[in-house]
From Swiss-Prot:
GO terms for molecular function: zinc ion binding. Coiled coil: none annotated. PANTHER family: ZINC ION-BINDING PROTEIN. A zinc finger (GRF-type) spans 26-69. Transmembrane segments: none annotated. Zn(2+) binds at residues 26, 28, 50, 61. This is Uncharacterized protein At4g04775. Keywords: Metal-binding, Zinc, Zinc-finger. It comes from Arabidopsis thaliana. It comes from the Eukaryota. The lineage of its organism: Eukaryota, Viridiplantae, Streptophyta, Embryophyta, Tracheophyta.
Amino acid sequence: MSTNSYYSSASSSGFRVCPPGVPSKCWCGEEIITFTSKTKENPYRRFYRCAIAMKRENEEHLFKWVDEALLDEIKMVNEKCKRVVENISDLRMNVMANMELLNKNAKQMEEELIKKMEGELLTMKENVEELGHVMAKSALKTVGVAVVIVASIVWLWGRV
């Protein structure tokens, strides 16, 4: 945008409705130029104006005070910031809820694994004890069979 001097006593209410914020183009598609007012009512006040408006004064082309446009822009940015803060708050709440759910599930899985491991450990302990008894019985049987064999050999030796 360029800056020019322009004699203007127009107010924003006398022209076509402008889009909020800082305009980039007029409704007709022309670029916007920044001018400085030289009127007694608005001395050195800057405004945006369509380049064609200078040539076609009977048509209603874009006119907007720079300070009003900047205020509109600030208001829009503030509203966007509020929406971003709300979105972040919502996101934070969702993340916290998910974290609580994950912690609850992790604790539940840990408890289930501990119970399962305790059950397996008890089963293994019982199996080891049973195996010990079986091995003890087996050892007694082996000793008994060995005694019978030795006694048979001694008896047979004695008969020979």
